[in-house]
Amino acid sequence: MQKKTLSDVAIQGKRVLMRVDFNVPIDEEKNITDDKRIVEALPSIKKIIDGGGRLILMSHLGRPKGKVNAEFSLAPVAHRLSELLDTPVAMAKDCIGTEVMQAALALQDGEVMLLENLRFHAEEEANNPDFAKELASLGEIFVNDAFGTAHRAHASTEGITHYVPVAVAGYLIEKELNYLGKALDNPERPFVAILGGSKISGKIDVLENLFTKVDTVLIGGAMVFTFFKAQGLNVGNSLVEDNKLDLAQALLKQAADKGINLLLPDDVLVAATISSDASSHVEAVNSMSDGMIGVDIGPKTIEKYRNEILAARTVLWNGPMGVFEIDNFAEGTFAIAKALAEATSSGAITIVGGGDSAAAIAKAALSDSITHISTGGGASLEFLEGKALPGIEALND
């Protein structure tokens, strides 16, 4: 998908209005507990400032439900951003209105202003055209660098593009399109996809789209038990979507018909309850005990999956292998994370999409050892499903 980017436009002396994703966690003392999303936007921000642009940033934060709520003010973000840039960041009182317009017009080359939370106005999520038009009037160039909200047609992502002369992608979105797009359109092979998580229902569209692209699919997480039950195996008390058994069978048949190597676990870690103090042991999937719950993939499966990952040239991972939030049930997920890091160092392209997988990579301190970690949970999932993302479709080709 070829879209014009920040590199294609002249920004010197221009008011550049950029949609970013500054939806960061903030504690009760107004401290930002994780500034990853702010840091990720810095390349685009610095490009505009250093190029003499007059930067106006906009974002949402939390869910203020269309009303002004001081708890969701972006002021702490302006403060943190000014520390990271070592330059003042003006905090606007609102995101539209005369006062904001005057402040935007008063900006000098290389100066930065952050607008107040877009979602203080219900019109943002409703994609109200008047609101979009008013936002658009603040800038001369629009840049979207918020991949995490690209799957939403909101005023600041989609509506605004109808009222600006220039609408381009920032570096963060460009990077997402390069990695996710290349993996789906023109991957180096073998291409292995690893899908985890608890429900098949959340991954049907991803599976069906990937069946047209990949060579091998490795399945983990609780969704394996729906596949096993569909094959007539005993799954004890493991999580199963009983209304998706036919679908599971259909997916297995579809993979076989398309010549996809779809692998399921050979062994699983089981426990009587999902709790940190529960004792656990490994069982073969064809002889699971009654009353037990599958909580992770077992050692044989880890080895089997690791070998597939290390033989791949492109690896895409979405979803954990087990209940990785509990340390005793996290081994499979961390083993996959380590295998991805190993594959990367051997020259494979490795892509991680989805919040849980990214969290596992971070917890294993391997974030720097992966080619690309997607910044958008829902957006990357919809992209992998082959769906058009309104916030990106709307940008200039």
UniProtKB/Swiss-Prot annotation:
Monomer. The gene is pgk. SUPFAM superfamilies: Phosphoglycerate kinase. It comes from the Bacteria. GO terms for biological process: gluconeogenesis; glycolytic process. It catalyses: (2R)-3-phosphoglycerate + ATP = (2R)-3-phospho-glyceroyl phosphate + ADP. GO terms for cellular component: cytosol. This is Phosphoglycerate kinase. InterPro entries: Phosphoglycerate_kinase, Phosphoglycerate_kinase_CS, Phosphoglycerate_kinase_N, Phosphoglycerate_kinase_sf. It is found in: Cytoplasm. The keyword Glycosyltransferase does not apply.
